[in-house]
């Protein structure tokens, strides 16, 4: 019998193969690379063990997964694909983009909106969400992750999906409040990141770990799962411990709020307004929170 050839044969063969049963070299995940620490990425590629998540973190991740699925269901008729895979073997990077949105001309308010957009969904605690909202820009690592998707999808699909940019959609996991930002391709930024990846891969091939790490003041050192084996991270934490302490924003906000509430309660009890103190409206105006 003549062997079948062509696309139909390819699909038949593909469906007889379990991709998870095939031996695979470790690859870099976009979310890991987006952290900006190439030593962290190197540890992952080497398969260094991480401590298990505690139950609370597991529940938080589960909430994020549920939010992703809900948002994807809402957009299923507006996306050409969800969990869109890409792989770039030269840099050992692969991943799944949350979705590729298509805005049809008849649905666009402006002509510039029409076209294909990569989607990235992020769930955040209320305090983190408020910071992003107040800043008016997405977090640096989320911008970097969006750039990786734009580049990776372009490489893997060879430009057949002409992505105009990416949309980073934030959702407050406590209130379901939301906001979104547009991110456009930045060839210079992605070229710099890929050069760092190439240097890291070349070093690993020669048995060397990279010295491309986050600055000592970066908050991520305290949450790194590799801190026990990471000398730069341990030095960074030692440096942070001797720096002058400042009151965390959330703690300061709680203190101010409690004092204002106590003052209002005292006024209600005595029937007279206490002198000297500022109202919440005065404070908000002074701190430009309005």
Model feature map: region roles:
Residues 51, 133, 238-239:
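Short amphipathic alpha-helical leader/targeting segments
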Residues 27-30, 136, 265, 279:
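Short, solvent-exposed coil/turn linker segments
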Residues 1-118, 125-127, 140, 244:
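Metal-dependent nuclease catalytic cores that hydrolyze phosphodiester bonds in DNA/RNA
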